[in-house]
Amino acid sequence: ILFCFLLGPKSVFALEDFQSVQSHSFVANVASRVSPSVVRIDIEREIQTDEFESDLLDPLLRDLLGDLGTLPKKERGQGSGVIIDSSGLVLTNAHVVERVDRVAITLQNGNQVDGTVIGTDQVTDLALVKIKEFPGLVSAKLGDSEDIQVGDWAIALGTPYGLESTVTLGIVSSLHRDINTLGFSDKRLDLIQTDAAINPGNSGGPLINSNGEVIGINTLVRSGPGAGLGFAIPINLASKVANQLLANGEVIHPYLGAQLVLLN
């Protein structure tokens, strides 16, 4: 009885301490550290549309009227980005900010600032945006995408469907996934594959490891029955592209000046 009396209270305190430590998962800790560096990107671009493209117009009448010109129309889109430098540099996807008239960046604290596209690279689907210096900007810590392995934890942060500060968890499902096998023959990329949920609006947001380091930039998803596969651009490549965009506004890619033909 004396033995239990002496150890009992100490054991209870130890258990309470353990439960306190375990009250939040590593995902919560990582998300709280990285979320201030994740931004929402809203864009506007002007497109030309058929003046009589309305579904209310009878198809026969539309054919009789013919081509009577086009009308300008405002198109709006949304994506994600990650602050990679506290001076206001935001890394995102090229398809998020290409040919835009206006870029608005919403920070985690709700403040919205205008952004300027420094440059885009269609081959790697990466872009660099500069926002004006704003007090308290927090840059994310970049990891080493050569150091990750299949089975490592993968955490996706972003604003899918405009839902800010969304966090999803998965693993690295595969490495060096050729983007050409996914139907994008105009790009040259080996992607990180993950089962962390990535949806429209996640594009340009970071893929994070369990240490809170950015290992990739989320770029596309393959959905459908039995699918739901997400893909991210390795951060080592993204960093190189960002440096070139910052220095030159563009990325120069080497190519072979030759054409393959079939010989009979």
Predicted regions and their residues:
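Bacterial N-terminal signal peptides
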Residues: 1-9
